[in-house]
Amino acid sequence: MLFRSYYLEPVESPVRDDDTAREYPLVMTNGRVPFYHHSTLRNAAAMRELYPVPEIWIYPDVAKAYGIAPGDWVWVESKRGKIRAKALVTKGINPGTVCMERFWHPETMNTKTHGWQETNVNVLSKSTAPFNDVVGTHTLRAYQVRISKADSAPEGIWQKPEDFVNWLPLGKA
């Protein structure tokens, strides 16, 4: 046999810790959407029309249990932070899992939080030990969260095409 199977349950897991699982019953994973490259293009109106705000993918039965409808703003909270995202209710995700793409809002660059602390999934992730013992990475995926319906979107973000303006930061000469 060339390869030996290896699996290690994540440090935060409903399988490992019942107390945490009760408080944070969902597992967060994250990835990328095809409209943006790393942290770029969120200032381009055409791209924001395609993917205007961060979305959280939620399985329909889970959304219903939390009183969340498609398009509702949702609080997403881990042990490390709390952000908001818009609900995308879909059968394209497992019932115990939610998924988000990292996001920031360049239109709020002049605010105290520079437009990322309200909606960026990285606020929720872990960057301290224990690390993945095989490759030494931080836990950027597979950590526990809870969700609840939010009253509104974060203040000052573009949500509709008529809000979008091409924006380019200008450096000082």
Walk through the language-model features, giving the residues of each.
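Long, low-complexity segments enriched in small/aliphatic residues
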Residues: M1-A44
